């Protein structure tokens, strides 16, 4: 029973953690007690001491050592306390001056801010006065912009209302530049334009220029029964016109057009090999190969 009581309470790996054991493990390490930092006592000045110090501070903010010692003897305080008081008093004085300057600036700033809205209002009124004439002049601008609409509106309506007249006028304007017998040619195609009411005939009639190679691609999708039915009636107007090889300005170098005037017969051979155009005894015939 006594041996149980004498057994050390903490045993780690067979080593008893006692004070003697710690001393054996760390003989060179000392554990000195941490010295408590002595706090300097706060000096409390009486009213009489403050009056003496304030009187000296009013004379000079930076007293020399002799003046500080003299005041320290008067108020029964060490000279270091007097020196610290002057240091703190100068800092307080600077802080007060800074606050006064900031307060003065804060007072001046609202006075600056108050007229600034008035200036802004005056500037806004000035700008509104400057911009008000453009607002008044903008009405004639709108009227002038509406005027071209009223002028151009008949022109925009007329092509929609009468597409045949515009297409025929385009033909009459375009073909006299290339063909010598333009009047008869335009009259001959005037009848065909009535059958192409909703289409742009200029794109399909321009193959009569020297560029007929691209016309085969444009005319090839037109090999339909509806187009043939319309074209079967149009050669009467074309056959009534007399065309000579010398009257039409076709170049003999055009590989895509073979024009022959044999018993008033027309023959157009395209490279696309999709259209065989023959006019024999006033008959039109389209053969889609």
UniProtKB/Swiss-Prot annotation:
Subcellular location field: Nucleus
DNA-binding region(s) from the entry: 38-97
Keywords: Developmental protein, DNA-binding, Homeobox, Nucleus
Domain of life according to the entry: Eukaryota
GO molecular function, one term: DNA-binding transcription factor activity, RNA polymerase II-specific
Recorded GO CC terms: nucleus
Transmembrane annotation, as ranges: none
Matching Pfam families: Homeodomain, TF_Otx
Extent of Low complexity compositional bias: 95-106
Disulfide bond sites: none
Signal peptide: none
Skewed-composition ranges (Polar residues): 123-137
Site entry (Determines DNA-binding specificity), positions: 87
Region named Disordered: 93-137
Family the entry assigns: Belongs to the paired homeobox family. Bicoid subfamily.
Physiological role: May play a central role in the initial events of axis formation and in particular in specifying anterior head regions and their spatial relationship with trunk structures. Activates the head organizer gene cer1 by acting synergistically with siamois and mix-A/mix.1 through the 5'-TAATCT-3' element of the cer1 promoter. Also binds as a complex with lhx1/lim1 and ldb1 to the gsc promoter to stimulate expression.
Protein name: Homeobox protein OTX2
Source organism phylogeny: Eukaryota, Metazoa, Chordata, Craniata, Vertebrata
